[in-house]
């Protein structure tokens, strides 16, 4: 069994050793819930990594969005290069759910665009959980949504070993049951091809490796791994396991049983609708369901098959659907990052999904069983979650209640950095005073973040500062993903000095060069000026030893009082620690590499404008990547390996950029 092994030039420092020991003690004493209160820059990810290494338990880390999940994934992958670090988020680049608008009698078909790279990573995650224990899965809230049952998924795997008797026709049939497609021309993930005594399989969990099976009659002589692009043999395998090309693969007898159950439910529902004199709804439901049943009978699948998932998994009405949590071993560990956001998000998922589907069922677009194709209810998630460590700088009410108000604090930063000084100034002449503070900060070579309450004020302030010849930019939700990252990069490099926004704490702003955070109208109580929001915003200035925060307010609100008092408490603890240990605070010097993958795109002859257009249009991106794949394989078949390698690099750069920006 592989053990977790951290590969890093750093050792736990500051509050980290104490926090690691306390959390592990709690885990060993069977505490179900613990709270790790980690401030900005305290090394929460590294602390989690050390807890994982010392407990040596399979781990799921939940984040509240894809961007944060991707950041944690990249960090954990660099810390644990020898272990299985996996990424499990929604594989939709674009998703329009099936819905019906009663007021206008409008039915909207489900429309989606699947990201092949993320689909591959989801398969890799479930495979790792079934095959090994040294696994860390970083996931979004996608992990509480229905997935194929793990027992069926594992039951359908094909086990292969050299010397084994495995009739080739049976293997072909088994691969088709696993939803692999035969394609002797375009060899890609989820496909297989046959040539003479050889069969090539491109597993669903790989992007750059395939397997070649060589037969002598019905005997499997050998299996070797090869590069599907160049055909180069990589290594010989003593065994191979082929998992389904979908998490919803199932034996034919299970499909037949499901079809019978669907037919029974259809008849009951039709009788009910007719008894209510809903003849149009009954006719609509009958036509739609019979078409799906015909497709299931002939092909084993149909559009919207997930709406019948209850019958395929063998669950009863109302029972929770199988999710990623059922793939976790009993002794797994769960971290919930930014729990003050993640927990309410988990709580909200079920109700929003239920409301939409009830309308579809009521108006004859779906059978009532479609209601069981859903995310977990909060109470169900509570039951399924293993030992949990909530992680946040601003814990929510649920986490504090679960842990009895006991928190393990990460307040001392390894760099010795202090929480920023907070200054409260009158809001009456806030813009005039802000300009004076901006000039002082710019003179020291640092950057400024300004947060406003409204979009109009942000726009007006940006224009005003630009008229005064300050290098200012307004960061808002309509900015394209590529442009947003370039703006942040320009801010760090000094091309921009001032960034204005409404909710900067939500934008993932992490700028070591930030010397001033200005919060305008800080005394206007509400979501954007709550205690949690203020503490999170104040934390944006905690990456620089000269960072400070100015709150413009004409009155002291409860939120300001609590946020400033908490920041001062932490600052005093940090100052005492630094004085005791002779530590001088050092600004974090982090390399500017956010656009690395995008620069690789440009190096491969894809201009900036084209990259921006592609990354913000999933359909165009997929079409362009499909075109690149075809050109790549064509170049390889013509033995033009240099050209094929260039195309492969461009394709990989696009995939990585899309992942980072998703």
From Swiss-Prot:
Pfam families cross-referenced by the UniProt entry: Helicase_C, ResIII, UVR, UvrB, UvrB_inter
Cellular location(s): Cytoplasm
SUPFAM superfamilies found in the cross-reference section: C-terminal UvrC-binding domain of UvrB, P-loop containing nucleoside triphosphate hydrolases
Keyword field: ATP-binding, Cytoplasm, DNA damage, DNA excision, DNA repair, Excision nuclease, Nucleotide-binding, SOS response
Bilayer-crossing regions: none
UVR domain boundaries: 622-657
GO CC annotation: cytoplasm; excinuclease repair complex
Gene Ontology biological process terms in this record: nucleotide-excision repair; SOS response
Record-listed ATP binding positions: 38-45
Motif (Beta-hairpin): 91-114
GO terms for MF: ATP binding; ATP hydrolysis activity; DNA binding; excinuclease ABC activity
Primary residence: cytoplasm
Residues in Helicase ATP-binding domain copies: 25-414
Helicase C-terminal domain mapped to chain residues: 430-592
UniProt-listed SMART domains: DEXDc, HELICc
Domain notes: The beta-hairpin motif is involved in DNA binding.
UniProt xrefs under NCBIfam families: PRK05298.1, uvrb
Subunit structure: Forms a heterotetramer with UvrA during the search for lesions. Interacts with UvrC in an incision complex.
Biological function: The UvrABC repair system catalyzes the recognition and processing of DNA lesions. A damage recognition complex composed of 2 UvrA and 2 UvrB subunits scans DNA for abnormalities. Upon binding of the UvrA(2)B(2) complex to a putative damaged site, the DNA wraps around one UvrB monomer. DNA wrap is dependent on ATP binding by UvrB and probably causes local melting of the DNA helix, facilitating insertion of UvrB beta-hairpin between the DNA strands. Then UvrB probes one DNA strand for the presence of a lesion.
Similarity-based family: Belongs to the UvrB family.
Name of this chain's protein: UvrABC system protein B
């Amino acid at each position: 069994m592989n053990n977790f092994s951290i590969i890093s030039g750093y050792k736990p420092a500051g509050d980290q050793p104490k926090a690691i020991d306390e959390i592990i003690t709690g885990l060993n004493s069977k505490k179900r819930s613990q709270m790790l209160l980690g401030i900005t820059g305290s090394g929460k990810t590294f602390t989690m990594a050390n807890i994982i290494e010392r407990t040596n338990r399979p781990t799921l880390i939940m984040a509240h969005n894809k961007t944060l999940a991707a950041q944690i994934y990249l960090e954990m992958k660099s810390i644990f290069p020898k272990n299985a670090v996996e990424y499990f988020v929604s594989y939709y680049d674009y998703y329009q759910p099936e819905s019906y608008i009663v007021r206008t009698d409008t039915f909207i078909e489900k429309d989606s665009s699947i990201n092949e790279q993320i689909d591959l990573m989801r398969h890799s995650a479930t495979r790792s959980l079934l095959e090994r224990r040294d696994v860390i899965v970083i996931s979004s809230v996608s992990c509480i949504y229905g997935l194929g049952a793990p027992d069926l998924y594992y039951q359908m795997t094909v086990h292969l070993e050299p010397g084994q008797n495995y009739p080739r026709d049976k293997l072909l049939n088994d691969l088709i049951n696993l939803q692999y497609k035969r394609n002797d021309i375009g060899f890609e993930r989820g496909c297989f091809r046959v040539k003479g005594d050889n069969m090539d399989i491109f597993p669903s969990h790989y992007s750059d490796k395939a397997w070649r099976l060589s037969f002598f009659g019905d005997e499997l002589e050998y299996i070797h791994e090869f590069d599907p692009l160049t055909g180069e043999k990589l290594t010989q395998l003593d065994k191979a396991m082929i998992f389904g090309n979908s998490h919803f693969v199932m034996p034919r007898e299970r499909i037949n049983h499901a079809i019978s159950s669907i037919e029974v439910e259809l008849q009951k529902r039709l009788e009910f609708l007719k008894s209510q004199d809903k003849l149009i709804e009954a006719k609509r439901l009958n036509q739609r369901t019979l078409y799906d049943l015909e497709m299931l009978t002939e092909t084993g699948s149909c559009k919207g098959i997930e709406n019948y998932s209850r019958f395929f998994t063998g669950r009863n009405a109302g029972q929770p659907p199988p999710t990623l949590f059922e793939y976790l071993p009993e002794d797994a560990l769960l971290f919930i990052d930014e729990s003050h956001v993640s927990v309410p998000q988990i709580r909200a998922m079920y109700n929003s999904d239920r409301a939409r589907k009830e309308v579809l069922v009521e108006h004859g677009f779906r059978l009532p069983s479609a209601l069981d194709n859903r995310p977990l209810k909060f109470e169900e998630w509570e039951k399924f979650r293993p030992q949990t460590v909530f992680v946040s700088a601003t814990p929510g009410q649920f986490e504090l209640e679960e842990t009895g108000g006991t928190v393990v604090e990460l307040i001392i930063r390894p760099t010795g950095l202090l929480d920023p000084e907070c200054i409260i100034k009158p809001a009456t002449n806030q813009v005039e005073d802000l300009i004076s503070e901006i000039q002082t900060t710019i003179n020291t070579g640092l950057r400024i973040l300004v947060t406003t309450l409204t979009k109009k004020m942000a726009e007006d302030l940006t224009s005003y500062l630009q008229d005064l010849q300050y290098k200012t930019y307004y960061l808002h939700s309509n900015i394209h993903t590529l442009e947003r990252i370039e703006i942040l990069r320009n801010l760090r490099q000094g091309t921009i000095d001032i960034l204005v926004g409404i909710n900067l704490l939500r934008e993932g702003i992490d700028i070591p060069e930030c010397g001033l955070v200005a919060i305008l109208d800080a005394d206007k109580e509400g979501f954007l000026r709550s205690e949690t929001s203020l503490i999170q915003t104040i934390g944006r200035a905690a990456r620089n030893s000269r960072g400070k925060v100015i709150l413009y307010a004409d009155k002291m609100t409860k939120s300001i009082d609590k946020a400033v008092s908490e920041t001062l408490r932490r600052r005093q603890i940090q100052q005492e620690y630094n004085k005791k240990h002779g530590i001088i605070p050092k600004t974090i010097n982090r390399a500017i590499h956010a656009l690395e993958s995008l620069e690789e795109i440009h190096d491969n002859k894809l201009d900036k404008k084209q990259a921006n257009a592609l990354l913000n249009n999933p359909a165009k991106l997929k079409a362009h990547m499909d075109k690149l794949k075809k050109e790549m394989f064509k170049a390889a078949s013509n033995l033009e390996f240099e050209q094929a390698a260039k195309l492969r690099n461009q394709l990989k750069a696009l995939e990585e950029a899309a992942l980072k920006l998703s």
